[in-house]
Amino acid sequence: MASQPHLVPDRHGRASSEGRPGHRDRSADGPQKELIERAYRTAEQLGLPVFCQDEAGPYQAIPQPGPAWQPSGVPVRHPHEYVRGGTVKLLTLFRPATGQVWAQPVDHAPNTVLHPWLQDELTAILATLSPTTVPVDAVTTRAAWTIWQEGLSQPFTLPEELPPLRALLVWDNLAGHKTPELVCWLCAHGVMPLYTPLGGSWLNLAESIQRILVRRAIVGQHPTSTNEMKDWLTAIVRGWNAAPTPFEWGGKRAARRQRAHDRRHALGGSGGCTRRPIARRCRRTLSHTIGDHRAN
């Protein structure tokens, strides 16, 4: 779309149109999406763990709608009068390749609560990972970091001295996730943050595991206090980690969709398609048909 349209005037001025910053033909969110998808598909195979972080909630200690296990014909009944028992949020750190979850129910999740919790969890996790024993020069080390900023229009500045890259962290593009103190701490411990684009929280697999945990813990229940909700969430997380399910980005369903898309036949003049090719009459046959019609 042109940044300065010549048609459709707006009163005494020109009509406004949406333009993109810089000299780009594509959305600026594309590189962020591609980096996160590449991390999900290839990083673990290269020995680089990928973690996702998110905060779920707040969830109120009130009767929660949803299905519940009840005898047939005896639905669960919640009181129509109740007292609000406060709210709970769930801090979640998730490793999709193994399915393991580190979670902490809290009353609220400002930076003063989130940052120390995340630092403690990452410190404990990094201590369990195999350390890098092969000496690597500074140029190779920086290249391993900068490859995860490839194509970004506004990448954050990496420190001058970088340790070996040990993990990737996918989380939302929030101001509290970009404080200089936290970003410097992550880089100092070998963790590269990957931020989801605006409106791209669906790229964070922590959203999926949180939905599963919360649905199992409180949907269809009637918690009366925040402590009760915290106990339920903690128990569900403990049960999940007893037999975790690994997550895979895309998977067989995405491959089937891609094969179905490849089998389609695009139509000219629109974005439509057909599932089988349309028979086209050759030019020679068409000319003979027109000639015969004129002769008759």
Regions found by a protein language model. Give the residues of each.
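Conserved short alpha-helical interface segments
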Residues: 1-23, 49, 55-58
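C-terminal domain-tail junction helix/linker
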Residues: 25, 231-296
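Extended, low-complexity cationic-aromatic segments
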Residues: 30-131, 139-145, 256, 260
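Short beta-strand segments
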Residues: 51-53, 167-172, 194-197, 248-251
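RNase H-like polynucleotidyl transferase catalytic core
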Residues: 76-82, 188-205, 221-223
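Active-site proximal helix-loop segment of RNase H-like, two-metal nucleases, encompassing DDE(D)
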Residues: 101, 192, 206-228, 239-241
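Acidic/histidine-rich, metal-coordinating catalytic segments
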Residues: 131-152, 164-177
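Short, aromatic/basic amphipathic alpha-helical patches
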Residues: 179-187
